[in-house]
Amino acid sequence: MSTEAQAGHWQDSWRDGWLLRARAVASPNFGPRPAGGGIDLIVLHSISLPPGQYGGPEIEQLFCNRLDWDAHPYFQGIRGLAVSSHFLIRRDGELVQFVSCDQRAWHAGRSSWRGRDNCNDDSIGIELE
């Protein structure tokens, strides 16, 4: 496939910042990106909820503000946390998208990279289960 064909193929895979190949689960935890900025950073995280447990619904519940804080003792330490990520790649390979790439997900917290603060402003957050 030519480079032009590959580029066209990927352009057809997106709509309003959503990757059509991903399962969309809209998170309320996002905001606008600063005007005039662009995306030039990818932040990779690893996550399991509760820690060391995989494949359950808790990550999606956390990112959508639906986690039962009383379901596991660990959750008391993160009670009230409002976070999200653009993408989650599950251990079985499933790709889930929570926030449009045109928007600012809340994954990096207070952050700095190479002298720039607020990494959420110009990054894509990807969680690896």
Across the structure, where does each feature detected by a protein language model lie?
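Active-site-adjacent loop/helix surface patches within enzyme catalytic domains
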Residues: 2-33, 41, 48-129
